[in-house]
Amino acid sequence: MQNSEFKYLIRVSRTDLDGNKKLIMALQDIYGVGEAMARAIVRVAKLDPNKLAGYLTEEEVKKIEEVLADPAKFGIPSWMFNRRKDYVTGEDKHVIESDLMIIKQEDINRLKRIRCYRGIRHELGLPCRGQRTKSTFRRGPTVGVSRRKK
């Protein structure tokens, strides 16, 4: 394919990416990066989206990490970020990996602490978004119906 050395694992922002996958698919293995964000990163970094991730050079990996660190600086619109109008700072940012997991858990704990509807539903392990619970979200083993004796 290319003259450069093929690598089976590529380390991008604390995540090992599969070198056999196409670049857009490999970037989606990073927690917090979906298909739209992966396409935007590849477009902004001026990389071939069909290129296998194993053929990335060190410079290209650094460019991807720079875009992931501050996507707004590279012209990615704020509506693509996963943390708009942050509760603490009020700024738009895109958070990935363990930072996203921590922030997500802090948000849930804040909802529980202020005892809002969503927080209470989280505490009880029930759905927060209005789904019906008569037949779904049940816990425990299924109990069969016993027949009456004749």
Curated annotation (Swiss-Prot):
Record family assignment = Belongs to the universal ribosomal protein uS13 family.
Q: How does it assemble?
A: Part of the 30S ribosomal subunit. Forms a loose heterodimer with protein S19. Forms two bridges to the 50S subunit in the 70S ribosome.
By its UniProt entry, which InterPro entries does this protein fall under?
Rbsml_uS13_C (IPR027437), Ribosomal_uS13 (IPR001892), Ribosomal_uS13-like_H2TH (IPR010979), Ribosomal_uS13_archaeal (IPR019977), Ribosomal_uS13_CS (IPR018269)
Q: Any keyword Ribosomal protein?
A: yes
- What's its job? Located at the top of the head of the 30S subunit, it contacts several helices of the 16S rRNA. In the 70S ribosome it contacts the 23S rRNA (bridge B1a) and protein L5 of the 50S subunit (bridge B1b), connecting the 2 subunits; these bridges are implicated in subunit movement.
Q: Name one Pfam family in it.
A: Ribosomal_S13
Q: Which residue positions does the secretion signal occupy?
A: none
Region Disordered, annotated ranges: 131-150
Q: Which PANTHER family match?
A: 30S RIBOSOMAL PROTEIN S13/40S RIBOSOMAL PROTEIN S18, SMALL RIBOSOMAL SUBUNIT PROTEIN US13
| A cellular-component GO term for this protein | small ribosomal subunit
One of its GO biological process terms is: translation
**Database matches in SUPFAM superfamilies:** S13-like H2TH domain
Q: Which UniProt keywords apply?
A: Ribonucleoprotein, Ribosomal protein, RNA-binding, rRNA-binding
Name of the featured protein: Small ribosomal subunit protein uS13
Among the GO molecular function terms of this UniProt record, one is:
rRNA binding
Per the record's keyword annotation, is Ribonucleoprotein included, yes or no?
yes
